[in-house]
Design a protein with these regions (language model features):
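TPR alpha-solenoid repeat register
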Residues: 44, 77, 110-111, 164, ...
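Structural register within alpha-helical repeat arrays
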Residues: 48, 80-81, 114, 151, ...
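Structural motif corresponding to the intra-repeat A-B loop/turn of tetratricopeptide repeats
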Residues: 53-55, 88, 121, 158, ...
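Alpha-helical segment of the N-proximal tetratricopeptide repeat
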Residues: 33-69, 80
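Solenoid-like repeat scaffolds
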Residues: 31-37, 65-72, 99-106, 133-141, ...
Length: 265
C-alpha cells in the first residue's frame, strides 16, 4: 500500500521582478546541485530573505524555511535560516543552522556569527575558544574584523576592559576608513573605551563612527549626543562645585571679618 504524500506547505509569494539571478555567484554555484526549476525557486526565496531581513523578519523567516524545505543540503539556505534566527535572538537555533552550513560547505566564514551566538547563550569561555580555533585563520580580512568586534564585546561582558580595547587596536582602525565594516569597528572601539572609563576617547570614536556610518547601521549619532551631553553636564556640575567653594570661602572671610571686629571692640 502506498503511503500518501504529505501535502506541500503553501509558499510565500515572490514578486514578479525577483528572478533569483540577483544572488552572488558562489550561491548560484551551490544551487546547481538542484533541478533547474527548483534552483530558480530556491534562489528567489533566498533573494527575498536578504530583502526582508531588516524590515520584516517574520516574512524573511517564511522564505528561509521554504528554501530549507526545498534545498536542505544547500549551505546558503541553512545560512539564511540561521541569520533569521540570529536576528531574532534565537541563539541555539541560529548556531544549529550555522553548524549545519559549515558541515555542508566546509567553510568557516560564518564563524563570527557562531561566536556571537555562543555569547548570546551566555557561554563566553566557549565563545572565546571558538574564536581562537584554527578555523579563524581561514577568515578573510572583513570576517576577521567582525570576529574582533564580537570578541571585544565578550571581553566587556567579562569585565576585561583593557583586553576589549587592545583587541580592536588593529591596523584597520583608521579614522579615515570608509570600508563597509568601518562604522561598526569604530563604534565597538568607542564602546570599549567607554567601558574602560575613557569618555574623551569614546566621544572621539563615536564621532568617527557617525561620520563613517553612511548606511545608518549604528546609533553612533545618538550615542555621541548622549555622551556629549553627559560630559557637558559633568563640566557644568564641576563649575557649580567651584562656585559653591567660592561662596563658602566668601562666607568664611565674612566670619573672619566679624571676629576681627569683635576683637577690636
Amino acid at each position: 500500500m502506498l503511503t500518501p504524500k504529505t501535502p506541500r506547505l503553501p509558499e510565500p509569494a515572490i514578486p514578479e521582478d525577483v528572478t533569483g539571478f540577483e544572488l552572488d555567484r558562489s550561491v548560484k554555484n551551490q544551487l546547481r546541485t538542484l533541478s533547474k526549476e527548483n534552483a530558480v525557486g530556491v534562489g528567489q526565496h533566498l533573494v527575498m530573505v536578504a530583502a526582508l531581513l531588516d524590515s520584516d523578519i517574520e516574512a524573511a523567516q517564511a522564505h528561509a524555511e521554504t528554501a530549507v524545505r526545498r534545498a536542505g543540503r544547500v549551505p546558503a539556505a541553512r545560512e539564511a535560516l540561521g541569520l533569521v534566527h540570529y536576528r531574532k535572538g534565537e541563539w541555539a537555533k541560529a548556531l544549529s543552522e550555522f553548524r549545519t552550513a559549515r558541515r555542508l560547505s566546509g567553510s568557516s566564514h560564518m564563524l563570527p556569527f557562531m561566536v556571537d551566538a555562543e555569547r548570546g547563550l551566555g557561554r563566553h569561555e566557549r565563545a572565546l575558544d571558538l574564536a581562537a580555533s584554527p578555523e579563524a585563520a581561514s577568515l578573510s580580512q572583513d570576517e576577521r574584523i567582525e570576529l574582533a568586534i564580537v570578541v571585544s564585546g565578550i571581553r566587556r561582558d567579562l569585565g576585561q576592559y583593557d583586553a576589549a580595547v587592545v583587541g580592536l587596536q588593529l591596523p584597520q582602525l583608521n579614522a579615515g576608513s570608509r570600508h563597509p565594516w568601518a562604522a561598526r569597528l569604530f563604534y565597538a572601539y568607542a564602546e570599549a573605551l567607554l567601558a574602560k572609563g575613557d569618555e574623551d576617547g569614546a566621544l572621539t570614536w563615536f564621532g568617527h563612527a557617525a561620520r563613517a556610518d553612511l548606511e545608518g547601521e549604528t546609533d553612533a549619532e545618538e550615542r555621541l549626543a548622549e555622551l556629549d551631553g553627559m560630559v557637558l553636564t559633568d563640566l557644568l556640575e564641576g563649575d557649580d562645585d567651584y562656585e559653591d567653594d567660592e561662596d563658602d570661602e566668601d562666607d568664611e572671610d565674612d566670619e573672619d571679618d566679624d571676629d576681627y571686629e569683635d576683637d577690636e571692640d
